[in-house]
Amino acid sequence: MLVKSYAAAVQGISATVVTIEVNCTKGIQFFLVGLPDVAVRESHERIISALQVSGYKFPRNRIVINMAPADIRKEGSSYDLPLAIGILAAAEELDASRLGHYMICLLYTSDAAD
């Protein structure tokens, strides 16, 4: 099943909408395309762990994820949540009918005082 979700690529004070397309089919591979950096490519392991801890099962399907536009570099772990939600929706574990109406943004800051 093909589903779309939306995130944002933040560059300075501006942001570009990133369309995340997830397709689950039979197979066991995981592909992530659309100019992701190392942290985004490593999201696979973080997402599997987070879904298991949350009581979901990571689909044992071939998962292809396209992050568009392809010419904008996607950096950091802020895409983990929209990727995880897209994977669950494509695997029909979540209702995808309203997914296209929202942008899923995750921002983490660490400003712990020393």
Where are these regions (language model features)?
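Conserved small/polar residues in nucleotide/adenosyl-binding loops
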Residues: Y108-D114
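Conserved P-loop NTPase/AAA+ ATPase motor core
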Residues: M1-C105
